[in-house]
Amino acid sequence: MEKFEQFKGIVAPLDRANVDTDAIIPKQFLKSIKRSGFGQNLFDEWRYLDYGEPGKDISLRQLNPDFILNQPRYQGARILVARDNFGCGSSREHAPWALQDYGFAVIIAPSFADIFYNNCFKIGLLPIVSEASIVDRLIRDTLETDGYRLEVNLDAQTVTTPSGEIHRFEVDSFRKHCLLNGLDEIGLTLQHADKIRTFEMNRRDRQPWLFLQQNGDKLRT
């Protein structure tokens, strides 16, 4: 997992509440267990006018010109501002995978579904809970201003607008540490590799019967 760095990015507004995970990445695209390749089907039923299927050539599909992510001014957006209860519905990990694969690094909303919120941190995607009134202003300003950008500083836990207005946000200290240091669950485990190795060696001495083959010979290490 990459370290989360301070950055300034283009904002895309998604002025909808209760966006569920099936809207984020429809069920027909869940067959893959890889984390990559989902970005092209993010919000598939809203981005395209035809029905999407795995393996379908994206270049041949008809874009919905009214959908926010298809508008030129929001190309390259790294921050998504949404409404209440973002990520509700089924607990598919593919939803944050699709958002990240598209290019988003931060999602700002008044509230998130719990499982979606937790899944975001596991892959290095930062979900920021912000007051509804602040989200209102961000969506309004983004719609009114081409190239609207926000600066996100996780270390200081701040979001800064082009006018210099600073909004603070809360984040669990452990999750913050993991994002800043690029540590997912595997990375955290590998920090204790020496202790794990020592434990396994000692366990062979204490419980040798666990390491015997059916014929009584010791398993190779």
From Swiss-Prot:
Q: Which family does it belong to?
A: Belongs to the LeuD family. LeuD type 1 subfamily.
- State the reactions this protein catalyses: (2R,3S)-3-isopropylmalate = (2S)-2-isopropylmalate
Q: What EC number(s) is this enzyme filed under? A: 4.2.1.33
Signal peptide from the UniProt entry: none
Quaternary structure per UniProt? Heterodimer of LeuC and LeuD.
Q: What does this protein do?
A: Catalyzes the isomerization between 2-isopropylmalate and 3-isopropylmalate, via the formation of 2-isopropylmaleate.
Task: Give a Gene Ontology cellular component term annotated to this protein.
Answer: 3-isopropylmalate dehydratase complex
Q: Which GO terms describe its molecular function?
A: 3-isopropylmalate dehydratase activity
One biological process term in Gene Ontology: L-leucine biosynthetic process
Top-level taxon:
Bacteria
Keyword Amino-acid biosynthesis attributed: yes
Write the gene name.
leuD
Associated pathway:
Amino-acid biosynthesis; L-leucine biosynthesis; L-leucine from 3-methyl-2-oxobutanoate: step 2/4
Query: Sorted alphabetically, which PANTHER family does this protein's record hold?
Result: 3-ISOPROPYLMALATE DEHYDRATASE SMALL SUBUNIT (PTHR43345:SF5), 3-ISOPROPYLMALATE DEHYDRATASE SMALL SUBUNIT 2-RELATED-RELATED (PTHR43345)
Quote the InterPro entries the UniProt record gives. Answer: 3-IsopropMal_deHydase_ssu, Aconitase/3IPM_dehydase_swvl, AconitaseA/IPMdHydase_ssu_swvl, IPMI_Swivel, LeuD
Top enzyme category: lyase
Q: What is this protein called?
A: 3-isopropylmalate dehydratase small subunit
